[in-house]
Amino acid sequence: MEGIHKLIFLALIWIFLITNIVDAQDQQGFISLDCGMPRNESSYTDESTGLNFSSDADFISSGKSGTIKTEDSDSGVKYIKPYKQLRYFPEGARNCYNLTVMQGTHYLIRAVFVYGNYDLKQRPKFDLYLGPNFWTTINLQDPSGGFYYRIWLQDGTVEEVIHMPKSNNLDICLVKTGTTTPFISSLELRPLRDDTYTTTTGSLKLISRWYFRKPFPTLESIIRHPDDVHDRLWDVYHADEEWTDINTTTPVNTTVNAFDLPQAIISKASIPQVASDTWSTTWSIQNPDDDVHVYLHFAEIQALKPSDTREFSILWNKNTIIRDYYSPLEFMADTVPIRTSSKCGDDGFCSLDLTRTKSSTLPPYCNAMEVFGLLQLLQTETDENDVTTLKNIQATYRIQKTNWQGDPCVPIQFIWTGLNCSNMFPSIPPRITSIDFSNFGLNGTITSDIQYLNQLQKLDLSNNNLTGKVPEFLAKMKLLTFINLSGNNLSGSIPQSLLNMEKNGLITLLYNGNNLCLDPSCESETGPGNNKKKLLVPILASAASVGIIIAVLLLVNILLLRKKKPSKASRSSMVANKRSYTYEEVAVITNNFERPLGEGGFGVVYHGNVNDNEQVAVKVLSESSAQGYKQFKAEVDLLLRVHHINLVTLVGYCDEGQHLVLIYEYMSNGNLKQHLSGENSRSPLSWENRLRIAAETAQGLEYLHIGCKPPMIHRDIKSMNILLDNNFQAKLGDFGLSRSFPVGSETHVSTNVAGSPGYLDPEYYRTNWLTEKSDVFSFGVVLLEIITSQPVIDQTREKSHIGEWVGFKLTNGDIKNIVDPSMNGDYDSSSLWKALELAMSCVSPSSSGRPNMSQVANELQECLLTENSRKGGRHDVDSKSSLEQSTSFGPEHIPDAR
């Protein structure tokens, strides 16, 4: 009876397996492209694999078709049909396939390259990209260069990666790196289950996929579809000559295993002839620093006697125990993954050992193994909405540019012609900020798709053949500050909303060379009555000339009056008091601008003296731009009403005609950046001084956030804006971008993004929502600068942004790789670790994960006390918060504390 039950069980397994194979043979979700196959040829089914291949012509807009010239007669290799033709790319630096995929689904992506001397030229070498990220280098010039499936690719190679797309579109790009021509024979995508090849980050680049047999590999030993329902390519691993092959005709139950292992793989193995021997295998990888993920597939394929036991331990690289005791399941597939920060040896060699335990009577073995390298894809793709919109625009105008392939914005060296993009953090999707389609040969009306580029700041459509009206939606694009429509055939009136924005200095609008008028009523001036109006043109022109002359005279008169006294009408909101200086007085203070101290985006800063004994720094606005005046006014208004020991003091200002000047107290030790990585970094700051500067800056910022009413957000915290007096006391400066923020139930201000690259809060950058936590992020970046003396952005590092770089280094747990070596280890490690943890919490990508400035200020004071106690004194450090520090206010400008 037991035998009958076993037969029934095995029969059910076979039925299930056959059903699985039939279901899988429909190749649902498979993408199989025969690259170079003409568009007009019909799809076909390859005889040897049963796979349905079709032309790649609908998935790429460039390249030419070629056919291999030779097959390897010596080895008897006969390439399957998809690998006999190819697509090569003699033009363009980057050529990309664009494929529609299922977002969030894991795909096996395979690219096959069979050279076959198709062009009778030099074998090529080029790069392969997955979206905007480097995948691998294809090197057919090196005969030993990583040809994995050599038995069936004698004149080529294949690359595989398991990748989960983050959108419904996937770009696979071939990038020219030298003088040779990139090409590809086949591109194959296979959807996989999401519970098999998993990673917390990155994708899995295939190194090897083996099953173990004693015979040397042959063409027939390659196993793929239809045996493998996922079309994985399995190559035989030539086992030790002293091993013995075993196999079974009894079906192995693979239904309990998510990997859907083929019967042709899991029913075979090779074991040591001596039961006490260790089962070992070794292989090499190109980069020893890569994390390696290994999947070991087992099944007991021998009918064991009651007295038999097969038990062994699994060791990685001779010393890391993966399993102390493991026994394969009898006629059932099982997988043991090794994927926790596993690395090979320093020489790039990896090893796996299966060692028999004392209680085992049978030798160990492994049926099959897959080895992957972790491929970190750090650069995010351009915002999906922007990409979709841009492709709609491309289709509307039939734009054909050689480099309009792949991701529009990244990598930066391949940015599409006519675009500028924001690309501040690799972890944040770039956004399209500028379009310059001048002289693109555009025809038709201005497409409404443009309005969906909601981060667009500049739009240049000049010198095309555009017709129709100027659309109203341009005035509703909140960030748009420049529009050039010159040199087209646009007609009708310009929307009044756009004209109002231009009049108020909110936008630059260029529209000459069109049939446009400035009066909305001109659109109705058609029909018979229009001839009478034309008779009035000479009269109106004469009247207009007289009007212009009068207007010019009035304007000259106004300008002369403005030179005599400052304007008050347009600047009435600025506080006017005794600290207002004339430009002549400024010239006296600076001794005719004799001694420049530095130059920045605002203008030049000069040294000066007030009352012959008080040194000051005089900042002169370089030109009277609208934005410059706005920042000037914001800074004066703020500094006239708030006073704090850690905020720079405004001595006075000048607002006279075109002359805008700010006069500050003189900070003799410059700014913090100069002492960390600039001209003064040769005399490094001690850890104590660094902590004091950080704590004092935090106190000034805390005061802005909770000591003012309305509370203020600085928006431009950076080491260059932290000034140091003769005692190295820190004072926060440059308040031109500062904004008040709401209290009560409102949590943020929606505003255009402003700030400095590297210091800018990524959440604010992404959402346009400004909160006090945006300042906290910027301060966290400064604190990392203070600890490391590293630049905020450095493209030569493993991670370009300082926050990502420190996080990367922290995974090794060695603080010495992070701390500024110029401190020579002279610091209290506990205070430094606490400051480092605080900095990393400040630069959390999510504002909800950041502390507020009061918490930051208090923790820095504790760090400072710890450091001072190590040195045996407090060194004049006061642990009070910034609100308890000595402050002074004019009687009419006392801010309310919340």
Swiss-Prot record:
Q: Does the keyword S-adenosyl-L-methionine apply?
A: no
- What is the residue range of the signal peptide feature? 1-24
| EC number(s) given by UniProt | 2.7.11.1
Post-translational modification Phosphotyrosine, affected residues: Y664, Y764
The record's annotation in SUPFAM superfamilies points to: L domain-like (SSF52058), Protein kinase-like (PK-like) (SSF56112)
Q: Which residues bind ATP?
A: L597, G598, E599, G600, G601, F602, G603, V604, V605, K619
Q: Which keywords describe this protein according to UniProt?
A: ATP-binding, Glycoprotein, Kinase, Leucine-rich repeat, Membrane, Nucleotide-binding, Phosphoprotein, Receptor, Repeat, Serine/threonine-protein kinase, Signal, Transferase, Transmembrane, Transmembrane helix
GO MF entries: ATP binding; protein serine kinase activity; protein serine/threonine kinase activity
The record places the following residue ranges in the Extracellular compartment, namely: 25-535
Location of the region described as Disordered in the Swiss-Prot/TrEMBL record: 864-898
Basic and acidic residues bias (residue ranges): 868-881
Q: Which reaction does it catalyse?
A: L-seryl-[protein] + ATP = O-phospho-L-seryl-[protein] + ADP + H(+); L-threonyl-[protein] + ATP = O-phospho-L-threonyl-[protein] + ADP + H(+)
Task: Identify its membrane topology class.
Answer: Single-pass type I membrane protein
Subcellular localization is given as: Membrane
Q: Where are the transmembrane segments?
A: 536-556
* Sequence ranges of the LRR repeats: 455-477, 479-501, 505-526
The record's section on Pfam families has:
LRR_1 (PF00560), Malectin_like (PF12819), PK_Tyr_Ser-Thr (PF07714)
- Residue ranges constituting the Protein kinase domain according to the UniProt record: 591-864
Q: Where does the record place the modification Phosphoserine?
A: S750
Give the enzyme class.
transferase
User: Phosphothreonine-modified residues are where?
Assistant: T582, T751
Family to which this protein belongs: Belongs to the protein kinase superfamily. Ser/Thr protein kinase family.
Q: What is this protein called?
A: Probable LRR receptor-like serine/threonine-protein kinase At4g20450
